[in-house]
Amino acid sequence: RTAAETAILEELPPVSALILAGYMRIIGPTLLRAFPKKIINLHPALLPSFPGRQGIQDAFDYGVKVTGVTVHFVDAGIDTGEIIAQVPVNITDGMSLVELEQAIHRQEHQIFPATVKNLIQEGAI
């Protein structure tokens, strides 16, 4: 992982933050040191519930009535960084997993760019 992250740093143009969506890898210490509290991730569940790769599936299987989308800073854990923004998504009776995935993705497409824009305007990233 260190070699891969070093290669990423060598290839990146000068940037002030990393914005991740669908990056299904654990961020290691090389990138965390290079971008302290400047790596933003999108997660398809209301953290701290249902961390990891299968957030939508896990929420659906557990039977919760509300799940959602989280934008958070990346830290050394798996989906454990400081939460920046969240939006709920109701799971209605009879909703299929595909319908839930679509509802989650609709919310992701709204909250993620808006949150990143706010962070930039606030000078946080």
Model-derived features: positions:
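One-carbon transfer enzymes
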Residues: 1-125
